[in-house]
Amino acid sequence: MRDARKDAIEMAARRERLLEAGFRLMSARTIEAVTLQQIADEAKIGIATLYRYFKAKPDLVIEIGTNIWKRYYVEVEKEYARLNGPAMNAAEELEFFLDSIIELYRSRRDVLRFNRNFDTYVQHERCTAAQMRPYNDAVAVFAKKFHTVVRKARADGTIDIRVSEPKLFVNLLYTMLSVAGKYAEGLVYPPDGERDMTDELEAIKRMILGSLT
C-alpha cells in the first residue's frame, strides 16, 4: 500500500531539485540558453518526470522567479524587524530598502542575473496575465511595503515626494535593481579594473537620497 504522505514529500523534493537546478543553470548562463533536458540532467531526474511537474519551460521559469522573490521578502522582513523598522523615519526606511538591493549584489548576484534575464524571457514568450499572476503577487508585496515609506514621508517630511507613489516606487527601486543587475552581469565596464561595483551602488544610493532629502 502506498504511503500518501511519503509520496507527497518525495514529489515536493523532486520539484525543489528541478527548481534549484533550473536556477543554477539559468543564472550562470541565460534563461534562453538552458533547455529543459539540461535541467532534468542537472537535477538527475528524467525528462518525462520533469514534464509531470512543468508542462512548459515558462511554467518552470515563472515558479523559479516567484520563489526567489518570496524568499527574498522573508529575508527583508527579518532584517526590517531586527533593525526596528517601524521606528525608522521615511528617509531611513528608504535607505534600508536601497541597502537591501546592495546586499543582493554583495551576496546573491546569481539572483540579480536571473532577474535581469527574466523580464526579457517572459515578454519574448508572451506569457499571459494568468501565468504571471503568482510572480506578480510575489513582487506586489514590495510595493505595499514601499507604501509605508510614502506614508511616513507625508507625516515626517524627511523625503520630498513630488511624483505619484507608483512612479516613485518604479523610478527608485526598479532603477536600483536594474543597475545592480547590470553590474552583476558584468555589463558595465568597471573603473580602474575593479570587478566589485559595491562602491558605485553606494554612490547611486547617496545620490538618490540626496535628491529626495
What do the predicted segments below correspond to?
Residues 1-13, 80:
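N-terminal intrinsically disordered/low-complexity leader segments
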Residues 1-2, 100-103, 140, 144-156, ...:
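C-terminal peripheral helix-coil segments that are non-catalytic and often amphipathic
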Residues 11-22, 39, 64-68, 72, ...:
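Generic hydrophobic, amphipathic alpha-helix propensity
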Residues 17, 25-63:
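Helix-turn-helix
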Residues 21-25, 104:
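Short amphipathic alpha-helical elements of helix-turn-helix/winged-helix folds
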Residues 63, 78-111, 165-172, 201:
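Hydrophobic alpha-helical connector segments
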Residues 70-77, 92, 125-156, 167-170:
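Amphipathic alpha-helical packing segments from all-alpha helical-bundle domains
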Residues 105-129, 181-187:
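Amphipathic alpha-helical segments used for helix-helix packing
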